[in-house]
From Swiss-Prot:
Species assigned in the record: Listeria innocua serovar 6a (strain ATCC BAA-680 / CLIP 11262)
SUPFAM superfamilies on file: Tetrahydrobiopterin biosynthesis enzymes-like (SSF55620)
Molecular function per GO: GTP binding; GTP cyclohydrolase I activity; zinc ion binding
UniProt keyword list: GTP-binding, Hydrolase, Metal-binding, Nucleotide-binding, One-carbon metabolism, Zinc
Listed pathway(s): Cofactor biosynthesis; 7,8-dihydroneopterin triphosphate biosynthesis; 7,8-dihydroneopterin triphosphate from GTP: step 1/1
PROSITE patterns registered for this protein in UniProt: GTP_CYCLOHYDROL_1_1, GTP_CYCLOHYDROL_1_2
GO biological process, any: tetrahydrofolate biosynthetic process
Record note on quaternary structure: Toroid-shaped homodecamer, composed of two pentamers of five dimers.
Catalytic activity, reaction form: GTP + H2O = 7,8-dihydroneopterin 3'-triphosphate + formate + H(+)
InterPro entries assigned: GTP-CH-I_C/QueF (IPR043133), GTP-CH-I_N (IPR043134), GTP_CycHdrlase_I (IPR001474), GTP_CycHdrlase_I_CS (IPR018234), GTP_CycHdrlase_I_dom (IPR020602)
Protein name in UniProt: GTP cyclohydrolase 1
EC number(s) recorded for this UniProt protein: 3.5.4.16
Primary gene name: folE
Class in the EC hierarchy, top level: hydrolase
Amino acid sequence: MEQIDKQKIADAVKVILEAVGENPEREGLIDTPMRVARMYEEVFAGLKKDPSVHFDTIFEEQHEELVLVKDIRFSSMCEHHLVPFFGVAHVAYLPQNGRVAGLSKLARVVDDVSRRPQLQERITTTVAEIMMDKLKPLGVMVIMEAEHMCMTIRGVNKPGTKTITSAVRGAFKNDDKLRSEVLALIKHN
């Protein structure tokens, strides 16, 4: 995949600084354009990755009960305003035929999908779809809670508000008791 063009980003940041009336050559700002370019390379690293590869290795285990990894911290950039949003993801699945993934792989998929210009709704759906496709579980449930800086520092200016999204597939969609179990475990400390 094509590398991020850091010089092009730095040049654009310099233009933005000039457009808002700043002097990009003054002390404190002189290195800012390249700093921003390096930051974008890091926060958009998911653009260069295929998150589904984390499920290339599947383990056969005699476990067909709920698996939940909760409070996976993530951050992303709102594709509408290019400001951060961040929070936690809770990822649950119900293995089928003993097919389980390494627990860290769930967090890695969340990271790779998040690290690009993105919408929270799309992250939630994409993580669920990748898991259904690669793990072939009986069901998947992904819940994400995040604070969006586009609502906190601009526009409605509502710090502390959280957006919660969910993607519910398979057994979790059809079984209220199973879905309630996941929600109760997420709330449990």
